[in-house]
Amino acid sequence: MQCKTILAYYLTVIRYSIFLLGSLFLCQSASFAQSVDSIDSAKILKSPAPENNVELISFLQKADDSEKFLFFREAFERQKIHLFKNPRQYFGEDFPLIDYIQAWFLLSQARQQPNDLNTQKEIQNFLIKHKNDYIAERLRTDWLLVMASYWNERNQWKTFNSVRKQLQWNKSDPNIVCWDLYHNISNRKNISKNFANEALSIINAPRYKGNNICQKVSSALINKVPSTAFTRLVILIQQGRISEARNVLNVLIQKKRLPARASRLAFNSPAKWYRTYRNKLGTQNKHVRLIAAYRLTSIDIDQSVRVANSLNGKLNKAEKSALWGRLGYVGAINHNPNALQWYAKGGQSVCSGPYSALPSDCIQWQARAALRIKDWKKLNHLIANMPASMAKQENWAYWRGRALVEIGHAEQAPQYWRTISTKRTFYGKLASEALGQSFYYSDNETVEATHEAIDSIGKNPSLQRAKYFYDIGLFVEGNREWQWGIRTMNASELLAAAQWAEKHSLLHRAINTAIKVAEHYPLEHELLYPRPFEDEIEEFSEKAEIDDNWVYGLMRQESRFIAAAQSNVGANGLMQIMPATAKWIAKQLEIDDFKPEKIYEIETNIYFGTSYLRSLLNRLDNNLILATAGYNAGPNRASRWQQSLPQISEGAIFIETIPFTETRNYVQNVLANTIEYAYEQDQKITSFRRWLGEIDPKADTTTEEKI
C-alpha cells in the first residue's frame, strides 16, 4: 500500500512539475511557483487580461480543482491574481482549499490599492470568519507586511499593532518585529540608551540575519544613535555579512569615528594590514585593531591572536570578553589545541556582552574543547556555569554526569542522567545505559488510539487541508496546516493524529507527531520507526553489503520517507543524493544512460544511496560514525576531523565535537535510529557506548572513494 501511494504521489509530481524546496528534517522550505504542463501559465500571466485568454478559458473548463489551484497559486506568486475578477468562481464551494484562493485575491488587491477601504473591510471580515483557521493567521501576517509601509508613512501604526495582537504564531516574525522597530526608531525624536541597546540586540540575533527590513532598522538606528555603529560593525563581521558591514564602516568613517585609510585596509585586506603593521601593532588605533582582529579570525587565527594580544589593557570588559570568546570559538570549531587558552583570556564573562555574535555557540564550544581533550574537571566546571536552560539540554546533562564520574563524584551523576533517560534519543540511550537500564523501550504494553478517536481526529479541517496539500505535493503549506491543526492537542489526540497520518501513508507526519507523544505513552514501535520499501532496501543493502537498519535509520532522518523530496541545497529523493554525487555514482556503477530525473525513482535512489554508503565505508576505515558524517558533510571533511584528533577518541566524544551543528545532530539521530531499527529485527546490542566504538586518528583511509 505504501509503495503504491508513493508511486501515485511521484506521478503527481511529474504531472505538475513540482520541485520541492526546503529542509525535510525541519519540514520547512522556501515558497515556489508551480505550473501545469498543459498550459504556458507564465506566458498567459504576462497578459494584462489573462481571463480572456482562449487557452486559459479552455483549461479552466476542463481542469480538475487541484490543477486550477496550482495555476492560481502561480498567479499569486507572480502577483497577478488581482487580474482575475473572481477566481473563487472556478471552484466548487466544497473544495477544501477554496479559502486560500480568496485570501490570495484579497491580499493581492490590498497590495495594488492599500488605501481601498472596501478591501480592508473584506479582509477584516474574512479574518473574523476564519479566526480558528490557519489561513487567517497566514493572511493576517502577510497583510501586515503588505500594509506596513503604507501605515508607517501615514502614522497609522495603531492599526498595525491592532492586527499584530491578534496573531497567534507570528508575533515574533522577523519582518514584523523589524517593521515595528523601524517605525518606533523613525518616529522618536530621542532614543534612550536602553531602547537602542534592545533594538541592537534584536537585529544582531542570528534569526534576523539578512532581513531587508532589519537592515533598514540598522541604518535608522545608526543614524539616530551613532554610538551603536561600531557594535553593529563587529557583529556583522562575525556573522560574515561583509557587504552590510562595509556600509556601516563607511558611516563610521564619514562621521569621523574611524581613520579612513587604516580602517579600510584592516577591513578590506586584513592580511595586508597585518603585514604592514605587525612590528608596530601597539601604535595603531584601538578600533582599527579590533576590526583587523575579527577579520583575521577566518584568515589566519594566529595573526588574529597577536593583534588581540597587542590590545591587552586597552579593552573594556565587554570588548575583551567578546574578542577572546570569538578567538576561542573559532579555535574550538577548528580543533585548535590553543582554544581553551584563548577562552581563558576572556575572563569569567567570556562570550557575553553586546559584541558577542553567537554567545550560545561560543559557550558550548568552550565545553566541547574541554571534552575533546578529556579535561573532565574543566568540563564539569563549564557545564555547571552554563545558563540553566543550556545545562539542561540532553548533551550537557549527559556529559555533566560523565564528568562527575571521571572526577570521583559518581554518586552525583544519576541526577543528571535521569532527566533524559526516558527519551529515545542519542543521549537518552547513553544516559539509560549509564544508569544500568535498558535503552530499548518495551512495546509489550503499547497504547493505541481507538478507531473512533482516529476517525474523529481525521475530521479536523486543518488535517484535511494538510492532506490535500500533501497529495498535490505542497509540503510547506501542508506542514503549516498540520502544525496548526495539532497545536492545542493533548497527548491522546496527538496519538490519534499520528495514527491517522500513518493510516493515510503520511509517514513523515506520523513520525513527527508520534515523537511528541512518545514521552507520555509507550507506542507501537512501527509508528515511530516504519519500514516502507522493504524489498528494495533489503535487496540493495545486501548487494552493497551494508546493514539495512543503517539504511532505514539514515532514510528516516534524510527524507522521512518522502520519495520526491528535494532539499534546499538540491539533494534528491529518499536518500537525499546530490546531483553531482548521483553522476559520480552512475559512473562508478558504469551506468552510461543515467538521467538526473531518474534519481527520484525509488529503486534508483536506494540503489545509488546504498552504493554510496558502501564507498564511504571503504574509504573511512569501515567506520559507521565516519561514514554517516561523510554522507552528510562529505568524506573529505569526515577524514579531516578524524585525522585532527589528538588521540584515539571515544565515539560519542568525536560526534559531540563535530564542527557542523547539522552534521553533529544528523549523526546522532541516524545512529540512534539504526539501533531502533535493529531492535525490530531482534538484533539487540548490549552497550550503545561500546557499539559506537572509538575513532583512531591513525587509521588508514584511502584518498579515493570506490564502489
Which residues fall in each region the model found?
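Bacterial N-terminal signal peptides that target proteins for export
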Residues: 2-18
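Bacterial N-terminal signal peptides
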Residues: 14-28
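N-terminal leader/linker segments that initiate helical-solenoid repeat arrays
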Residues: 31-104, 111, 441-462, 471
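Generic helix N-cap/helix-start motif at coil->alpha-helix transitions
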Residues: 60-68, 93-102, 117-119, 132-142, ...
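Alpha-helical repeat scaffolds
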Residues: 83-89, 116-128, 155-167, 191-203, ...
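Catalytic glycan-binding domains that act on GlcNAc-containing polysaccharides
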Residues: 94, 98, 103, 132, ...
